[in-house]
């Protein structure tokens, strides 16, 4: 989709015309399969490296267009958020030192990006979800200023006719309504591509589904969103809900989310997979660059199947089927979309090597996996891995097994054999599979981040802890040590962080509030139980309407505790915005001689600064 000028499908005529070309693309693909035109070998690999742009104090930067212009390299492109960019690697033949060559290529490109970013007071970071993200960064003003992103945002919003409802429950809980698809921009991935022989495509696709849970478990690197500890790989939950075009869970024409693992094992041919997608998910976009693929094929040329690729670009399976043309030859690929970016480039390449090795190493025991494993087990394994990472218990071939045992005893040996049989350099196999093996025995990205985050909070605020985490990851992302060798942080501070602390960064977040209708007796006991002296008062709209203090209760006396909060609260309040500086907050408190300063945003009570 990124290469096409797209527009939203609106009129019945536009939809009919686009569908006409879409059906022709399917027929052309069938014809190419029948005539054995799809390339079978050599096999190629490739990757899409998404990364974040951060300011000098490690907050999201809005300078993607400026940085992209300075980079001036065709390998780079935009993402939906202004604080993200993407690198598309060159395709490489699957042989010898291809993985270390990819490592070097991405290292050079990321170094180029870092240098260009620095000229705009910006840094680059590879991580699954940027720890310093705040709610304001997912507003529409952070959408990258390119027409296709506004068109996609509009199309997805129109297909829902209501706000996106995000609810994720982990150790903490996140629940919010959002009016755009910008939550998608929270996710940063390392998407890996493997060319597949068309004769074995469906069986290979089902195998890719079967191994998704275990591969994800060892790769998890995104446990935090807006400071909350959610899933080991929170990207899975965020992306599933942020692109969901269903208005609720009961929809007749789309029982799956556009972001999904699937509903069953695939059967038939690769064209049947595309047919299923088209049957389930209505087209959202069209382009003026349509072509009659059958006519092109009849001329002896190879069509690009533009209509099909455009539709496929709005269906986000975690294992996505891809069609492409390279060197005048059509080919099929599986795109693995669930692997996160980071925490180091070496970790990312190791993740890819593990996945490719497993895909290549599929033994006779696992051929036709659809007849040997229940699909619900594969799907359940995937989402359990997203929640719990390496702490997952998998159901593998009808047996329960720990993630560690499954990796060390079964999957790592399969992957090594697959790589050896493909002629991959022995040193590369030892290096990258050694990283996976060491990570299984120690820590992966999400485990390191959670342990470090908890340790840092013993001395620092949640905001400072997230900032220091981000600073450390930036400093070490291209180092020789992979995450399995990182020490968990307990006290870390970079002197080059240029902090301009605001109220949002230091305000108390774990607060008790009372309603106007609550009794003063309840308020009195809450204050005694929790040893607090101030309680914000809110109405049913969550708007701050008053403040009740222990001094107020003393003045009233016990006889009046039967009355409501509304009858006794202070209503002439001094408040502050969460975006104001800490110096301003301190100044206000000193001037008015107060010990509690409520923080509000658009009349809604947020928290309190003491």
What would you call each of these model-derived segments?
Residues 1-497:
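Phosphate/nucleotide-binding catalytic core
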Residues 552-553, 567-568, 581:
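Histidine- and aromatic-rich ligand-binding microenvironments
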Residues 600-610:
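Short, intrinsically disordered, charge-balanced linker/junction segments flanking boundaries
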Residues 513-531, 538-539, 557, 575-595, ...:
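The conserved cystathionine-beta-synthase
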Residues 490-500, 550-561:
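Glycine-rich, positively charged N-terminal anion/phosphate-binding segment
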Residues 545-553, 595, 608-610:
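Short hydrophobic beta-strand motif reused across regulatory alpha/beta modules
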Residues 501, 518, 548, 563, ...:
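Short beta-to-alpha loop/turn elements within the nucleotide-binding domains of ABC transporters
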Residues 498-511, 562-573:
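Bateman (tandem CBS) regulatory domains
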């Amino acid at each position: 989709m990124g290469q096409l000028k797209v527009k939203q499908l609106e009129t019945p005529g536009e939809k009919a015309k686009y569908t006409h070309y879409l059906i022709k693309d399917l027929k052309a693909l069938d014809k190419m399969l029948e005539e054995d035109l799809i390339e079978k070998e050599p096999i190629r690999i490739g990757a899409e490296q998404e990364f974040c742009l951060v300011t000098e104090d490690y907050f999201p930067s809005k300078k993607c267009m400026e940085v992209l212009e300075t980079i001036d390299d065709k390998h780079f492109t935009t993402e939906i958020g202004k604080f993200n960019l993407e690198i598309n690697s060159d395709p490489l033949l699957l042989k010898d030192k291809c993985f270390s060559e990819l490592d070097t290529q991405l290292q050079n490109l990321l170094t180029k990006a870092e240098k260009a970013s620095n000229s705009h007071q910006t840094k680059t970071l590879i991580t699954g979800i940027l720890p310093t993200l705040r709610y304001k960064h997912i507003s529409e003003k952070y959408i990258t200023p390119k027409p296709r992103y506004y068109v996609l945002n509009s199309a997805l919003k129109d297909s829902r006719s209501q706000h996106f409802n995000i609810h994720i429950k982990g150790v903490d809980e996140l629940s919010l309504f959002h009016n755009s698809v910008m939550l998608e921009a929270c996710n940063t991935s390392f998407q890996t591509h493997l060319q597949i022989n068309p004769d074995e495509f469906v069986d290979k696709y089902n195998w890719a589904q079967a191994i998704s849970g275990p591969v994800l478990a060892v790769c998890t690197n995104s446990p935090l969103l807006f400071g909350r500890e959610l899933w080991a790989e929170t990207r899975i939950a965020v992306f599933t809900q942020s692109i969901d075009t269903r208005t609720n869970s009961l929809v007749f024409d789309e029982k799956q989310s556009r972001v999904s693992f699937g509903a069953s094992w695939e059967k038939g041919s690769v064209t049947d997979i595309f047919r299923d997608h088209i049957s389930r998910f209505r087209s959202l976009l069209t382009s003026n660059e349509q072509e009659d693929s059958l006519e092109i094929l009849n001329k002896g040329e190879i069509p690009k199947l533009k209509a099909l690729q455009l539709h496929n670009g709005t269906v986000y399976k975690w294992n996505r089927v891809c069609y492409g043309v390279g060197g005048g030859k059509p080919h099929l690929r599986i795109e693995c979309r669930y692997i996160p970016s980071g925490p180091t480039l070496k970790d990312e390449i190791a993740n890819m090597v593990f996945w490719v090795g497993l895909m290549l190493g599929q033994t006779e025991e696992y051929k036709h996996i659809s007849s040997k494993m229940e699909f619900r087990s594969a799907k359940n394994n995937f989402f359990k891995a997203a929640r719990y990472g390496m702490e997952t218990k998998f159901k593998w071939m009808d047996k329960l097994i720990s993630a560690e045992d499954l990796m060390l005893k079964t999957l790592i040996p399969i992957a090594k054999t697959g790589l050896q049989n493909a002629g991959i350099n022995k040193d590369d196999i030892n290096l990258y599979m050694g990283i996976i093996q060491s990570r299984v025995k120690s820590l992966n990205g999400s485990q390191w981040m959670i342990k470090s985050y908890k340790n840092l909070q013993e001395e620092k605020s949640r905001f400072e802890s997230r900032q220091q985490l981000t600073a450390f990851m930036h400093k070490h992302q291209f180092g020789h040590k992979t995450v399995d060798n990182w020490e968990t942080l307990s006290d870390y501070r970079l002197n080059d962080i240029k902090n301009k602390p605001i109220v949002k960064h230091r305000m108390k977040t774990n607060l008790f509030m009372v309603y106007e209708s609550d009794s003063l007796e309840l308020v009195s006991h809450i204050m005694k139980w929790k040893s607090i002296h101030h309680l914000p008062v809110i109405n049913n709209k969550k708007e701050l309407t008053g403040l009740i203090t222990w001094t107020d209760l003393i003045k009233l006396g016990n006889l009046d505790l039967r009355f409501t909060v509304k009858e006794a609260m202070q209503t002439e309040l001094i408040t502050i915005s969460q975006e104001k500086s800490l110096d301003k907050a301190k100044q206000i408190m000193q001037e008015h001689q107060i010990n509690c300063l409520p923080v509000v945003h658009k009349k809604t009570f947020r928290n309190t600064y003491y």
